[in-house]
Amino acid sequence: MTPLLLLAVLCLGTALATPKFDQTFNAQWHQWKSTHRRLYGTNEEEWRRAVWEKNMRMIQLHNGEYSNGKHGFTMEMNAFGDMTNEEFRQIVNGYRHQKHKKGRLFQEPLMLQIPKTVDWREKGCVTPVKNQGQCGSCWAFSASGCLEGQMFLKTGKLISLSEQNLVDCSHDQGNQGCNGGLMDFAFQYIKENGGLDSEESYPYEAKDGSCKYRAEYAVANDTGFVDIPQQEKALMKAVATVGPISVAMDASHPSLQFYSSGIYYEPNCSSKDLDHGVLVVGYGYEGTDSNKDKYWLVKNSWGKEWGMDGYIKIAKDRNNHCGLATAASYPIVN
């Protein structure tokens, strides 16, 4: 092959390999990069643009179907826009479902009229939405949020607790920092350690580090934890009578990655394969019929820009959708 012919073949191969972008997305792409402060090298830019466009088309298709009544929730482009679903799951979903020491079993209250709606934010026992960043520490945010609520109900003081303390210091109990963990392991660490520091004294860094716990800055403690039976009815009673509850869920789907508003129902969502720790802060229903369109009100740890200001409504009483009732628990605060 002559050099000129070889050069022509190479140029043709390069041209064929270059992604063909939809030019109508140019303004949105540049705005998205500016908003989320993305800087890429040339080769990575092409790849990330291709991923972003694929996600954008999926979102547009879903929202078109929503307008036609096919779905009960909307989707929108967000900070996860240049990630494939595989990358997204690896980076932010850090719940590690495994056998572990069980806590006390939740004793459901008898002869109690359970309210049809609950929102613990209205009682002042939920801190602002936080952001775990690119660290699989969802379990730490779920655990800290649950303990924040229990401490508030005991003391009347709402103090933001240190997720970094849990990330750095609970390895002996079985947690793996940014590589995942369990809320119950976190509660066990707090019990054995004798306390948990405040977020102010031990700020979040979104990466693994050495343990820097200082007892003089501890502002919360627990004496163990309670596991809730794997039924939505039991979870409902716990949320109504105990406070915000730590739960795990299947968060592996693109529909959740780009969730925006409405009641989330994903036909492929598993009630057993759980990969993300979150916090149930209430429940309710949309419309006028309390027996329809019911949802769990869930606080996430992906920042306020995701979902409904950091929250999501997940379908309730639909066969334990996404597994919220499968691994629910809360710390014991005396």
From Swiss-Prot:
Protein residues bound to Zn(2+) 6:
D273
- EC numbers listed for it are 3.4.22.15
Q: How is it modified after translation?
A: During export along the endocytic pathway, pro-CTSL undergoes several proteolytic cleavages to generate the CTSL single-chain and two-chain mature forms, composed of a heavy chain linked to a light chain by disulfide bonds. Autocleavage; produces the single-chain CTSL after cleavage of the propeptide. The cleavage can be intermolecular.
| Annotated positions binding Zn(2+) 5 | D250, H253
- Tissues where this protein is expressed: Both mature cathepsin L1 and procathepsin L are found in the upper epidermis. The lower epidermis predominantly contains procathepsin L. In seminiferous tubules expression is greater at stages VI-VII than at stages IX-XII.
| Residues at the active site | C138, H276, N300
List of residues binding Zn(2+) 7: D275
**What does UniProt list under activity regulation?**
Inhibited by the propeptide produced by autocleavage. Long isoform of CD74/Ii chain stabilizes the conformation of mature CTSL by binding to its active site and serving as a chaperone to help maintain a pool of mature enzyme in endocytic compartments and extracellular space of APCs. IFNG enhances the conversion into the CTSL mature and active form. Inhibited by CST6. Inhibited by the glycopeptide antibiotic teicoplanin. Inhibited by amantadine.
What induces its synthesis?
Answer: Expression in Sertoli cells is repressed by germ cells.
**Propeptide residues according to the Swiss-Prot or TrEMBL record:** 18-113, 289-290
What domain of life is recorded for the organism?
Eukaryota
Listed under subunit, the entry gives: Dimer of a heavy and a light chain linked by disulfide bonds. Interacts with Long isoform of CD74/Ii chain; the interaction stabilizes the conformation of mature CTSL.
What is the name of the protein in this document? Procathepsin L
Query: Which gene is annotated as encoding this protein in its UniProt record?
Result: Ctsl
